[in-house]
Each structure stands twice: as structure tokens, then as C-alpha cells.
Amino acid sequence: MSPKPSKNIKLESLLEKNTLNVVFYNDSFVKAGFFAKIMSKWDAPVFYFDFDLLYSGYVTAEEISLPKNLTILSPDSDNLIENLKSVIDKISKTKSLIVLDSLNGFLNLLEGKSDAARLVNSFVMLLVSSAKDVKSCVIVGSLSKLNDENEWVLYNTGRHVLENDHMTKIQLTQSDNEIVAKIPDPDNLILEI
């Protein structure tokens, strides 16, 4: 039996509470399903940076329909800066949803650069600062786990995940083939998706 939502907390209102939101997951298919559900509820423009190409694959295979308000960007080393500039210009003028899928893929794209983690953090903060005035929302997916010190770290690399006092943290799991989203705090509040 799937866990019941706590206190009728709607995920959409929680996401809009802070401009920056980080979604922790350990199953990429659950993450793709979660993002598909969230994006289907947004009327505003959605910009999806698909670094791991899983979501794009689902769209190409027609497993997931492409909402009319969704722009999928598949950044590579040649077009990353142009994509970021274009999206920053748009999200600074119009309320939007920005999905970075995923932090792991973003870091992989910049692999080999000695300052890759600093660059990724800077790009994320640039998106967030551009989004703030028009109340846009940035969601960063992160294939992560809790380490022995109870800190979120990326799978494979063990790098620490972005931490900020002004961001919402959401943990995804699956129960009885249902996606479960919860706030990983002492109360472990279950969110209604």
C-alpha cells in the first residue's frame, strides 16, 4: 500500500516556495516519471535540460507525450553556453519551470575541467537568480544517496550535492509502482503529486 500524503501538501505549491529545488533519487525511471507528472501540471513555459537523454528517449519512443509548453534542450560542450543564455533571457521575463536533468549529467558534460563543480554551481545559481524576479522555478535532479554523515552525495563520484538554505529538498522513492515524493527531514512529510 502506497504512503498517504501528509497534511495535504501539494507538490506544486512547495516547489513555488523556493526558486531552487533539488530532487534526490536513486532510480532514473522514477525520476523521469516524476518530472513528466510535474511538467504536465504546468501551464507556463517549461525548459528541460536533458543531460542524460532519458526523457528525450521516452519522447522519441512516444512513451511520454511532449506537452506544447515544453522545450527540451540536449546540451553538449558546443551548445551549452548558447542554451543557457537563451533560457536565462526567457526565464528572466516570463514565469517558467526549468528542469536540470541531472546534476550528474551536467558534471559529466564538463568532465575534464578542473573547476567542473564550481562551473555547475555557478550556472545553477545564475539560472536561479535570473528566475527569481518573475517567480520561475528551478528543479535540479540528482542521482544521489545519503552518506555515513547523513549528507547527500552523488552516486559514483561521492561529490557533495548543492546545499543552500533557500532551497526545497525532495526525495523520490517508489512504493507499489507509485512514485512517492517526500521532504527528507525529521518528519519525512509525504507530498501529493
Regions found by a protein language model. Name each.
Residues 1-18:
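Pre-Walker A adenine-sensing motif
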Residues 15-17, 66, 102-108:
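Short, basic/glycine-rich phosphate-binding loops at helix/coil junctions
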Residues 16-87:
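Conserved P-loop
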Residues 22, 97-101, 139:
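Structural motif
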Residues 53-55, 76-78, 104-105, 144-147, ...:
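Conserved nucleotide-binding/hydrolysis micro-motifs of P-loop NTPases
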Residues 59, 109-111, 149-153:
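Short, well-ordered secondary-structure micro-motifs
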Residues 75-134:
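Phosphate-binding/switch loop-helix module in NTP-utilizing enzymes
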Residues 133-193:
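Phosphate-binding/switch region of NTP-binding enzymes
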